[in-house]
Amino acid sequence: MAGVGRTMIAPLLVLNLIMYLIVIGFASWNLNHYINGETNHPGVAGNGATFYFLVFAILAGVVGAASKLAGVHHVRSWGAHSLAAGAASALIAWAITALAFGLACKEIHIGGYRGWRLRVLEAFVIILAFTQLLYVAMLHGGLFSGNHAAGAGGYGGDYPADHHHKPAAAARV
């Protein structure tokens, strides 16, 4: 059963990693031109929410890409010891991506001219908010399924990796 989990999570992991790298590229380009005062550049423009969106988009991209490194480690080792790091970093990356998603929605709602690069960045952040949530749900589904290596200190309560844990003796009355 562990193979089924890996085969489901691994493609989503790769997809999200590629999308986060694209977000880093577009957000850094837009932020660089925005900081340089080139808001009349055909690809930048924007409105009052643009600066905040760009900051959170680049933050979401960097944290998301870093969390995918923990995810790659988890998929390779597929144990409970790596699941905690992978799931925690994925949840943090999703939270920051959700903030960027909200700012993308606000930027779209305010309107005004936004260049094609900014619109592509908005689209990628919106898509990533949902694919990252799916990835987090799949990881947390594995947290409770017990499909991970038993010798890694699973969550079943048996503590197979803890050599010092001894079950409490029955109380004598």
UniProtKB/Swiss-Prot annotation:
Does the record's keyword annotation contain Transmembrane?
Answer: yes
Q: What function does this protein fulfil?
A: May be involved in abiotic stress response through abscisic acid-dependent signaling.
Q: Which coarse location class applies to the principal site listed for this UniProt protein?
A: membrane
The identity of this protein, by name, is: Membrane protein PM19L
Signal peptide from the UniProt entry: none
Q: Topology in the membrane?
A: Multi-pass membrane protein
Annotated localization: Membrane
Q: Which GO terms describe its cellular component?
A: membrane
Coding gene? PM19L
Keyword vocabulary terms for this entry: Membrane, Stress response, Transmembrane, Transmembrane helix
Induction trigger: Induced by heat shock. Induced by drought, cold and salt stresses. Induced by abscisic acid (ABA).
Entry annotated with the keyword Membrane:
yes
Read off the InterPro entries from this record: AWPM-19
What highest taxon heads this organism's lineage?
Answer: Eukaryota
List the PANTHER family hit by this protein, alphabetically.
AWPM-19-LIKE FAMILY PROTEIN
List membrane-spanning regions. Answer: 9-29, 43-63, 83-103, 124-144
Tissue-by-tissue expression:
Expressed in roots, leaf blades, leaf sheaths, stems, spikelets and embryos.
